[in-house]
UniProtKB/Swiss-Prot annotation:
This is Orotate phosphoribosyltransferase. GO terms for molecular function: magnesium ion binding; orotate phosphoribosyltransferase activity. Keywords: Glycosyltransferase, Magnesium, Pyrimidine biosynthesis, Transferase. GO terms for biological process: 'de novo' UMP biosynthetic process; pyrimidine nucleobase biosynthetic process. CDD domains: PRTases_typeI (cd06223). The lineage of its organism: Bacteria, Pseudomonadati, Spirochaetota, Spirochaetia, Leptospirales. Its EC number is 2.4.2.10.
Amino acid sequence: MKQKLLELILTHAYRYSEQPFTLASGKKSRHYFNCKEITLVPDRLELLCKFIVERHLDESGILKPQAFGGLTMGADPICYGISLEFRKQDKNIYPLIVRKFSKDHGTNKLVEGAVHEVKSCVIVDDVITTGGSTIQAIRSMRDSGIVVVQGVCILDRQEGGMDAILAEGVQMFPIFKKSDFGNLEHE
């Protein structure tokens, strides 16, 4: 399963360009991993979430919490998919979505989902570069009274994000690291 995911990422999500891409972190890179090409395609998302639930959690020592959540939009489909995989085992593991900004109407909540049912959460992201988006989600979860126990992401770009997140007290367990994709040309 993991090898198939790696091949799908290389085929569908990875892009190289002489003209650098601007990443969410603001950094520039000729290497771009658009994991939404995995998470927004049903059969690819299903394979990803099945791998996370059936293999990655146990192999990484990730505790099974009450919820999986992260910053919209990278985490959204992954959290929903993981929740549905657990439903196949007759377990309710809730998806939580963290907004980037609170709305100026309604409840003004940053964290959406069954927050009242949840005390602990595994934080989720698709790609981590500097860790800024993940840290924003962790802080919003904590402000909502949720303990973030650990984290999972599809790809660690190996640019300092894991250390920044660990400094927040959360250990991340990436499925892949950029180095897993071979000797990509240096920046």
